Every structure is written in C-alpha cells, then in structure tokens.
C-alpha cells in the first residue's frame, strides 16, 4: 500500500510541472518496472523530478545519482521563494509601478539561485539553496537598516538594467555590492594593522577579584565610526573581561 501511495504522489508532482499525462505516466512506469524495491524506485525517479523542476526533462534522460537532493520539498518551495523575492522587490516604488517586471525579475532571480546551487552540491541542496536565496533577498532589500541603505548597489543596477536578474544567483558579494565589499575590506585591513600594545591602568575593576590592577588594549572590532572595544586582563587573577 505504501508503494501505491508513493507512486500516486510522484505522478501528481511530475504532471503538475509537465502538464502531460501520457509522458508523466510513461516516465513513472519505466522507473517502477526497473525497481525491485521502494528505495530503488525513488532513486530512479529522483533525476526526473529534479530535471522537471528546471524544465529540462526528456524521455531519454540518463538515470544517475541525484547527490542527496530533496526534490519533494523543493518542488513546493520554489513558488514560495519566488513570492518572497516578489514581495521584497515590490517594497521599492519602481517595482510597485511595474508589477509585470517585478514578477519576471522575481522568477529569474529564484531560477538563478536554483541553477547556481544545483552546480555546487557540496552541502545538501536544500540547505545551500535556502541560504543562497536568503543572502540575495537581503542584498536586494531596499528597507535595510539606515547604515546599510547606501549599499544598495545591486538593487540600483537591477532597476537600471545594468544587472540581469538571471545572473544574480551566481555572483559574489563583491560583484553585487562593490561599495560594501570595499568598505568591509578596508575595515579588516585597518584592524589587522592597528597596534594592540597593552597598557596598565587602575581605571578598570576586575569583576572576578575586584582589584584595579589591569592591563588593557583597544581593538577596533566594529565600524570605523564606532568606539573601539577595550579588552582587559587582571594582573592579579588573570581574568579577562571587556572594559
């Protein structure tokens, strides 16, 4: 009985995307006849489901290992991700006024993330795909925190046409946000070059032994326009704390 339930579900998922009942039944039947266990049946059908999602399915597709992909979840997830991108883009006035373009870009951005992830395969597909989509969604969000609003390079290029939505999924952070990447690189370089010489002071009280015999050093751990972080070490008990 479990095998029949699984087969019905597979037929439904395949036909949902193929929109061709004859081809769907033929593919599913071939996989079923070649499999002698439910596990092998699922192994055989997976490549067809995966290619179905990318709309590249053919009757002569070679069956091979799908590298731990989770096709059943992804089939339903892609529509949800596309809607997420659509809502994020629509926060910008330009896309509110161009709904058709917003829909097109949302679909192409999601497809770009999908194909990029499909080529990676170092992690499980679902984990990599979700992470990639979340990163891209943050980058194109025009409602970032105030100190991040000037870093909307990718969104501005998307609107101007300089950046193609179908290419965004495979681009690096430096390619998508050159201004933010340069700023981050500058901060890292500055932190690595700064002097961290320790000084002795009685200004800081050790929370462990309550003594005021401490060495301290200042390190720029946050943005350049924010105060340095002071790391203290008690000379009496060796306890380390932030001043």
From Swiss-Prot:
PROSITE patterns assigned to the protein according to its UniProt record, in alphabetical order: TFIIS_CENTRAL, ZF_TFIIS_1, ZF_TFIIS_2
Keywords for this protein: Early protein, Late protein, Metal-binding, Transcription, Transcription regulation, Zinc, Zinc-finger
Cross-referenced Pfam families: Zn_ribbon_TFIIS
One Gene Ontology term from the biological process aspect of the record: DNA-templated transcription
Residue stretches making up the TFIIS central domain: 77-201
Source taxon at top rank: Viruses
SUPFAM superfamilies: Zinc beta-ribbon (SSF57783)
Gene Ontology MF terms in the entry: nucleic acid binding; zinc ion binding
Residue sites binding Zn(2+) per the record: 206, 209, 234, 237
Zn finger limits (TFIIS-type): 202-242
The family this protein is said to belong to: Belongs to the TFS-II family.
Described purpose of this protein according to its UniProt entry: Putative initiation factor. Necessary for efficient transcription elongation past template-encoded arresting sites.
Protein name: Transcription factor TFIIS homolog
Lineage: Viruses, Varidnaviria, Bamfordvirae, Nucleocytoviricota, Pokkesviricetes
């Amino acid at each position: 009985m479990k095998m029949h339930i699984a087969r019905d579900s597979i037929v439904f998922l395949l036909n949902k995307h193929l929109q061709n009942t004859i081809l769907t039944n033929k593919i599913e039947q071939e996989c079923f006849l070649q499999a002698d266990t439910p596990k092998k049946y699922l192994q055989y059908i997976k490549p067809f489901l995966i290619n179905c999602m990318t709309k590249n399915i053919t009757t002569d597709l070679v069956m091979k290992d799908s590298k731990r992909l989770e096709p059943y979840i992804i089939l339903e997830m892609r529509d949800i991700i596309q809607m997420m991108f659509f809502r994020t883009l629509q926060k910008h006035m330009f896309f509110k006024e161009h709904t058709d373009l917003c829909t097109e870009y949302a679909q192409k951005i999601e497809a770009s993330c999908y194909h990029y992830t499909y080529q990676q395969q170092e992690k499980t597909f679902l984990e990599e795909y979700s992470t990639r989509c979340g990163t891209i969604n943050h980058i194109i969000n025009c409602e970032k925190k105030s100190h991040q609003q000037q870093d909307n390079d990718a969104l501005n290029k998307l609107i101007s046409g300089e950046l193609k939505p179908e290419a965004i999924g495979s681009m690096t952070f430096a390619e998508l946000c050159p201004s933010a990447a340069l700023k981050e690189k500058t901060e890292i370089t500055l932190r690595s070059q700064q002097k961290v010489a320790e000084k002795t002071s009685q200004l800081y009280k050790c929370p462990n032994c309550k003594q005021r015999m401490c060495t301290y050093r200042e390190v720029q751990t946050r943005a350049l326009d924010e105060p340095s972080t002071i790391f203290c070490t008690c000379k009496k008990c060796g306890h380390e704390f932030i001043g």
